[in-house]
């Protein structure tokens, strides 16, 4: 990835759990970087910039209102993120994902293709891609911990996408689902409190893959 913002300087990252953060459609890495201070400080957070220019911002693949996608775009961006993770993962005790909006679609696609690679996943105000090729490639030996946060009245994610997302998450993950009334298509302070508790429990607690103080 060409542009990455880190929560810690390089000399403080070794041995820490890594949280890879993926922004939404038409946004950029700065949206995720603003959240660093609201997440457990034991993590090294990395906010990645999507490779496609979308208006004044960036994205991971082109979308329309119905969330129709070009699978070649999806795989291109997915491979770019996998390549970047490969370049840094040896420095870290575990890898987890955090995706907002389209970033949640990216995070779940990464999870579907390499489920054993990720300790936990957070998906906020987003969706899971409905794609036969991805469905055929899935191979989950265990249910990974997944936090799904949203507003039931979010008008950006259509009902069909939400229904598919809910069904997929219940089938394939160890799901923690929370809703936040009046939040809209955004991220709330209360939601970040719950996300932090989830990450502490599934990644930082004693006996987990990674340990540390929040």
Where is each model-derived feature located?
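Serine-hydrolase catalytic machinery in alpha/beta-hydrolase-like enzymes
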Residues: 1-94
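Active-site signature of alpha/beta-hydrolase-fold catalytic machinery across serine-
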Residues: 34, 109-113
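Gly/Ala-rich beta-loop-alpha elbow adjacent to hydrolase catalytic centers
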Residues: 98-103, 107
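A conserved short beta-strand
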Residues: 116-128
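Conserved serine/cysteine hydrolase catalytic core
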Residues: 128-145
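Acidic catalytic loop of the alpha/beta-hydrolase fold
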Residues: 130, 152-157, 185-186
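Short beta-strand/loop motif that positions the catalytic acidic residue
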Residues: 147-150
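C-terminal catalytic histidine-bearing segment of alpha/beta-hydrolase fold enzymes
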Residues: 160-214
